[in-house]
């Protein structure tokens, strides 16, 4: 039963990622934390999101903007160890509350799309990248700061997606390296790989047929519910 639920979470998140270019971690991380615990849930979200981003980058690497992304990912790499250290030092119930709250905060940032002119330049890339690295290592949701940076830089979705995928590859690889691989059985790893493939196929088939706005709303709704449940589970265990 556990592997069936795991497959469903990863497949849905993978499908969403292929439909919108982002959203894997927002959908998967809260659910995986509830299923596997905060540490292994975040680590698996990082592993899977890195694989999905790498697959997407294969066809979109020409759209990466090095001038913007080098300071962004450099800042993220510097703060990933801080996020991993923080997560490793907290008791599990407290960690669940903190991670759930970070997920809810991430949803709020995406929904409001804060306009801050200072986030458009190199300084903004450093600030957003630093926040993203910490949030990715601690809670598996490093995408919202990237979204805010893209909004304030005036990027279109076509410009945003390859840069977000590049960031996703780097920050997730570093996040896993700063921690460890999630403790899964060989069978569960096969399930995850198969679910990622199924999610990609379904997402590719539905691309252009499903309204992006509706998918985005579903992503944020699922993430908010998952974050709230994670907070509730943590509070229950205190």
Q: What are the functions of these language-model segments?
A:
Residues 37, 91, 156, 211-215:
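A helix-boundary/kink motif common to multi-pass secondary transporters
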């Amino acid at each position: 039963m556990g592997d069936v639920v795991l497959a469903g979470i990863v497949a849905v998140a993978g499908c969403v990622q292929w439909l919108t270019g982002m959203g894997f971690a927002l959908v998967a991380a809260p659910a995986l934390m509830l299923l596997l615990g905060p540490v292994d849930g975040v680590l698996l979200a990082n592993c899977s999101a890195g694989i999905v981003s790498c697959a997407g980058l294969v066809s979109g690497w020409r759209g990466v903007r090095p001038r913007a992304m080098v300071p962004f990912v450099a800042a993220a790499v510097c703060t990933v160890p801080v996020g991993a250290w923080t997560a490793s030092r907290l008791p599990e119930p407290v960690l669940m509350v903190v991670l759930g709250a970070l997920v809810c905060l991430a949803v709020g940032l995406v929904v409001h799309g804060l306009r801050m002119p200072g986030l458009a330049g190199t300084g903004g890339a450093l600030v957003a990248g630093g926040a993203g690295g910490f949030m990715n290592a601690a809670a598996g949701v490093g995408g919202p700061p990237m979204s805010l940076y893209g909004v304030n830089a005036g990027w279109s979705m076509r410009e945003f997606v390859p840069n977000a995928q590049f960031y996703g590859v780097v920050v997730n690889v570093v996040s896993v390296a700063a921690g460890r691989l999630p403790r899964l059985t060989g069978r569960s790893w096969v399930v995850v790989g198969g679910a990622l493939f199924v999610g990609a196929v379904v997402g590719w088939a539905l691309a252009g047929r499903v309204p992006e706005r509706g998918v985005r709303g579903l992503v944020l709704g699922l993430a908010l519910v998952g974050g709230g449940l994670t907070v509730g589970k943590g509070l229950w265990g205190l």
